[in-house]
Amino acid sequence: IKEMKLENLAARNVSELSGGERQKIAIARAMAQEPGMIVFDEPTGNLDLANEELIIQEAKKLAREKNIAILSSLHDLNQALYFGDRFFFLKDGKIKYAGGEEIITSDVINDVFDVNMKIITLDNKKIIIQGD
């Protein structure tokens, strides 16, 4: 509870918690078990932006400290860039691209998602935006 900054929720009844608060507790419970790997499906889907960033930062920190691998499915590619260090892109149910951040190019994104996107760099970070 303390590591995920959830002390303010400890005394509350579960029925009083919002969906986002329940999501944060579920993630904290999974991390507390110190498994070898955790699988997240849209781990920040019910969270506001402030809590989304907190969860990502704390999950990354705990994963490093406790040597836990995190496998996460995300539809927000910018969040994936922030969260991950290895990436797998599926197309037609098969892994089409795999690797580190270097595989994330406009060509790969446009191929996998059939959209016109481009990647820009801002403050040494890749950001995916709608293409022209």
Which residue stretches match the model-derived regions?
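Catalytic Walker B motif of ABC-type/P-loop ATPase nucleotide-binding domains
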Residues: 38-41
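Conserved ABC ATPase signature
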Residues: 13-17, 21
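Conserved ABC ATPase "signature" region
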Residues: 1-9
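ABC ATPase nucleotide-binding domains
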Residues: 102, 106, 112-132
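Hydrophobic anchor residue at the start of the ABC signature
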Residues: 27
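Conserved switch/coupling elements of ABC/ABC-like ATPase nucleotide-binding domains
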Residues: 88, 92-97, 102-103
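Conserved catalytic motifs of ABC-family nucleotide-binding domains
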Residues: 34
